[in-house]
Regions:
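Gly/Gly-Pro- and Ser/Thr-rich, intrinsically disordered tail segments characteristic of DNA damage-repair
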Residues: 1-276, 282-286, 445-502
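Short, well-ordered secondary-structure micro-motifs
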Residues: 191-192, 351-354, 425-428
Length: 502
């Protein structure tokens, strides 16, 4: 079997680096955080520059956490400064290192998602100068995998040299630096990038490149902690492993030899992936990823509200989300036969004594370890595959009324169109045999069906016209009355990409 060589490239603090470059600043020497300050200090930071991270700031923390950590760091600087005084501020790391009397400052840059996507496209064009698109998988806006097996001989370069050549081209073209991982499979190149590269010194351009094969992985990372540093090991998986005495990938590998059944009992068929990764194995290739076609598909929309909503106001937002989701179905030529709704409740339902005494239902723990009411979840089947706004909106409204506790404040909602498929592939309602009887007026039924078909055709034309207007003049060029009601969010979200300012 041919030995493959893969490269993973991650653009360093991508959003923050773009914002620095657009300001004519060095991303490696500037304290900058990308966050929408207009959403209050609880907003999530989308990116933090490396210099700001050096003060112990997380790359995905909340803005108030960044401010608090900088405040603490400045308190330490003041204690160590001459005369215990800080005189002036700077957001440049080099200036702060040279002058201990300066206070740490940082720039808060509002996100510009559309602009980051443009930058990402330009960088992808650089990748295409070296690697064919069929050998590249775009993992995210700032991360790619490449199968460079057949390119090393062509360029007469090692994998390390090829990775460096590509990264330096990106740096010269855009001013953005990167980290790379090289491995004999996709898992190893990802882990080399995520874990090993972080612990090696960067070169003068801020570039880090690390390499792993199976034996090196076992030698260097079988004792690494925490487990959540590894690709595809989330907090839930790590917690289960730790509860069963496994704290490292070496522990998982040992368990797979001595008690493999335990892993399958804990994780079902997903144990196979975990065991493979514990040994540094990964059989999936980029070619297989490109050829993969899922057996079933869905479209979804999720949203976390800026403040808790009463159920009726939350229902308005769910209806807005459903309306836009249906338009997305129509635009893609898809239909669905099932809608799924998940509604998460706010922590205030349990922290407010007046509300707490009224709630007697199940309680669960969120990611922050806080107690919240158990989320509502349900599904509703439609009368066949459809992309009718009227039918789907009625179904989701009915589902909301059925599953949501009317006494609880809502914080987040997810709407999913399940079993979606191309409209041309959808089974027709009258494909099967029909049982006739003497008591049904089939002429009236036929007229009723004709009227329904005509209504659906009118609705389809309205949907098509709406899409055409939105595409030409913008998503907010045409709005419904509900989008202007108090608490509606669609108008603001139409100006966003991925929930952040475009």
């Amino acid at each position: 079997m041919k030995q493959h060589t893969y490269i993973a490239i991650d653009l360093k603090s991508f959003y923050a680096s773009v914002e620095c470059r657009e300001r004519g600043l060095d991303p490696l020497d500037t304290n900058l955080v990308v966050a929408d300050e207009s959403r209050t200090d609880k907003t999530i930071c989308l990116a933090v520059t490396p210099s700001l991270k050096s003060y112990g700031i997380s790359g995905r923390g909340r803005l108030f956490e960044v401010k608090q950590r900088v405040k603490e760091a400045n308190a330490g600087r003041q204690h160590d400064a001459p005369g215990h005084r800080l005189d002036g501020t700077s957001h440049f790391f080099s200036e702060l290192q040279a002058n201990p009397s300066l206070a740490i400052d940082f720039i808060i840059a509002p996100p510009r998602m559309a602009y980051y996507m443009e930058y990402s496209t330009r960088i992808y064009q650089v990748y295409l100068k070296y690697i064919a698109p069929e050998d590249i998988v775009v993992y995210s806006i700032d991360e790619v995998f490449m199968d460079v097996t057949d390119y090393l001989n062509t360029y007469k370069l090692s994998a390390h040299d090829l990775a460096m050549k590509i990264i330096l081209d990106v740096l010269e073209t855009t001013g953005i630096t990167a980290t790379a991982g090289i491995g004999t499979n996709l898992f190893l190149c990802k882990v080399a990038m995520d874990i090993v590269a972080k612990h090696i010194p960067a070169d003068k351009n801020g570039v880090r490149i690390a390499e792993l094969d199976e034996m090196k992985f076992r030698h260097e990372l079988w004792s690494h902690q925490p487990l959540t540093d590894f690709w595809r090991v989330g907090r839930g998986i790590a917690k289960k492993l730790e509860q069963n005495g496994m704290f490292t990938m070496g522990d998982v590998a040992l368990c797979s030899e001595r008690n493999e059944d335990l892993l399958y009992k804990l994780f079902g068929k997903n144990a196979e992936l975990l065991i493979d990764h514990a040994w540094g194995w990964e059989p999936t290739t980029i070619e297989a990823i490109k050829a993969y076609r899922p057996s079933s598909n869905s479209l979804s929309s999720g949203q976390e509200l800026h403040c808790p909503y009463e159920p009726q106001k939350a229902k308005l937002v769910v209806r807005e989300m459903t309306d836009l989701l249906v338009l997305d179905l129509v635009d893609k030529g898809l239909v669905t036969d099932q809608m799924v709704l998940t509604v998460g409740y706010d922590i205030e339902n349990l922290t407010d004594p007046a509300r707490r005494v009224k709630y007697h239902g199940a309680v669960e723990t969120d990611h922050y370890g806080r107690q919240i009411p158990k989320q509502a979840h349900g599904s509703i089947n439609l009368d066949g595959h459809t992309s009718s706004t009227r039918k789907i909106m009625c179904a989701v409204s009915e589902l909301f009324d059925r599953i949501v506790d009317k006494n609880l404040l809502v914080r987040r909602m997810y709407v999913v169109a399940n079993h979606v498929l191309p409209e041309a592939d959808a089974p027709k309602k009258n494909d099967g045999a029909v049982q006739l009887d003497l008591f049904t007026d089939y002429a009236a039924e036929e007229e009723k069906q004709k009227a329904e078909d005509a209504a659906l055709e009118r609705e389809r034309k309205i949907q098509a016209a709406t899409l055409a207007i939105k595409k030409k003049y913008g998503k907010n060029a045409i709005l419904k009355a509900m989008n202007l009601e108090e608490g509606a969010t669609a108008k603001d979200r139409n100006a966003q990409i991925g929930g952040h300012k475009a």
